Amino acid sequence: MLPGSKIMFSSILPRLSWRYSEDLKAMDDTRKRLNRGLKSYLKKLRYYTIVYADFEDKHPSLFANDGIHLSFIGNDIFMHAMQSALEQFIHTPHNLVFPIDL
């Protein structure tokens, strides 16, 4: 369909609140499990994955007041990670995960 195209998965980011759920721990555990499973599966298919480690501490300044969307600073960090990942995938296409899995 699109020759030469590559598929990239952008990990699900954490949130300070989840719509339709009061159990933040259960939602975060599910998010982490999904990210791990997809990363592992997509690696086998030779697809790319971006992991956003900077968001795992869930610092409130990274999120808007609603606790769901990213703040200006959060968006800046997100876009910088996305750009860095794309550069890594272009220059070292054999590294399927950003940041590089060691």
Name the predicted role of every residue range:
Residues 64-102:
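Histidine-centered active-site loop/cap adjacent to the catalytic His
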Residues 15-19, 58-60, 87:
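Eukaryotic short linear interaction motifs
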Residues 15-54, 68, 72:
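Substrate-gating cap/lid alpha-helix
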Residues 16, 29, 60, 97-101:
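Charge-rich, low-complexity amphipathic helices
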